[in-house]
């Protein structure tokens, strides 16, 4: 049986950047059109070739297809985003590492410093936001294409993945518990599967949709 080749560094980088944007801000009208575009369908088809990602991609594809049947889909997605990621009650899935006891405080700041990165002043969220981890991973995968940095950047990539995996499973579980429509639950499941795949733990079980 032929094994499907792993994703290229540039492909990882682009996927992480895309996911960072979706977890950072609400989907606007333009973003909704992009989600339903042939370009995104092609990207998901590429990811789906990896057996470890296939089930998560299929679930997200179902949720994207269902958007066309959802009245006021953009407004409803915005409400889902707000309820999950911006509220502070027990029915939310806050995207901050500091909200999860498994995570060492300030870890992301150390990782960014090692990577020579700074958070843009326009970024108004706390530094430990999920989107920052994903932007860092995107940067590191692009940097892995430069041979003189490969060893250092790969070591930092592993540290970032390990740090993220300390709390990402609980974040994903919270998304499944509290996202009644399921788009962000499916998105978080795909993210978890990709991070595990990137970390070499693609054989671990993913969160099952209820």
From Swiss-Prot:
Gene3D superfamilies: 1.20.120.1820, HscB, C-terminal domain. GO terms for biological process: protein complex oligomerization; protein folding. Keywords: Chaperone, Cytoplasm. It holds the Pfam family Nitrate_red_del. The keyword Nuclease does not apply. It is found in: Cytoplasm. GO terms for cellular component: cytoplasm. SUPFAM superfamilies: TorD-like. InterPro entries: Chaperone_TorD (IPR023069), DMSO/NO3_reduct_chaperone (IPR020945), HscB_C_sf (IPR036386), TorD-like_sf (IPR036411), TorD/DmsD_chaperones (IPR050289). Belongs to the TorD/DmsD family. TorD subfamily. Involved in the biogenesis of TorA. Acts on TorA before the insertion of the molybdenum cofactor and, as a result, probably favors a conformation of the apoenzyme that is competent for acquiring the cofactor. This is Chaperone protein TorD. It comes from Salmonella schwarzengrund (strain CVM19633). The gene is torD.
